[in-house]
Amino acid sequence: MKKHAYLIMAHNNWKILEKLLILLDDKRNDIYLHIDLKSDFIDFSSKVHNANLFIFHEIDVRWGDISLIQVEFFLFKTAYCKGNYSYYHLISGSDLPLKTQDEIHAFFDAHYPTEFIGFSLGMTCDNRINKVYIFPKYQRIKNRYGNKVLCLLRSFCVFLQNLLNYNHYKLKDKLMIGPEWVSIT
């Protein structure tokens, strides 16, 4: 039996996450759930009866920060070390499958070993990665004036880099923009 690993990153929408876990609860699936360290820990173990559920509450995740990538690597590495899966699906805790588990497994069996990674045609991230953006971890702080000061500092920093024609990365390959959610072998 080919098993799938669902790697879920969650931080809120607990009712939707609960529904997601119920919909993924299938003996052909293992579920790796990371709940953001800033969020209250909720034990969803009682909601899953057929799949193996592994819950982690370890990393403080910030939007636009390296911590997002750290959680992704953590989930991929943990799942890879625990089992041999035909597919690894990285999804958010706010996603819900549109098909049944039988239909999902049949689709991926028919398309194995195709990698499903999205990107946007004609859009690159060159303008975003060529500059250094300061204080990404503090993108949203609670102090209104602090937010304005940080925003001005970031804007000024990018302005100076443009003025000096500074290029942080000199890449020959073109990097594309796309979603972080994937289904890979």
Would you name each region that the model predicts?
Residues 1-185:
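ER/Golgi luminal nucleotide-sugar-dependent glycosyltransferases, focusing on the catalytic module
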